[in-house]
Amino acid sequence: MASGKPVLGICLGMQMLGLRSEEGVSDGLGYIPFSMRRFRLDDYPELKVPHMGWDRVEIVQRDAALVQGLEQPSRFYFVHSYYAVCEDERDVLMGCDYGVRFAAAIHRGNVWGVQFHPEKSHRFGLQLLTSFSRG
């Protein structure tokens, strides 16, 4: 990370960028201060865990390089049981609602993370990965 080269964590890769998770006792890498929490959707019987399938995301930081060219709202493919809660809202790049509002994508400095799977997300994912590769 110190080299300044861009880093992109996808799904579990994003989760590892944070501080901690309710899932286990090991700390995360701590590159971005956030925690992972398990979905507790007792008040939403129509919603299942894991959160699986296509969902809309809201781009919060429109000027960030990673989201250039993306439609608003965009749709991405998710498969996860834990969601990110950032300590600093300025680290939230994209948000999503699934019983709770969570950070679907995060960014700080040269470190980027996405909870969804861009490689499974058709034109939206292709645009995001293209933007990342162009820096």
Describe every region a protein language model picked out.
Residues 2, 35-135:
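Amide-donor transfer/coupling interface in amidating biosynthetic enzymes
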Residues 1-52:
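Cysteine-nucleophile active-site neighborhood
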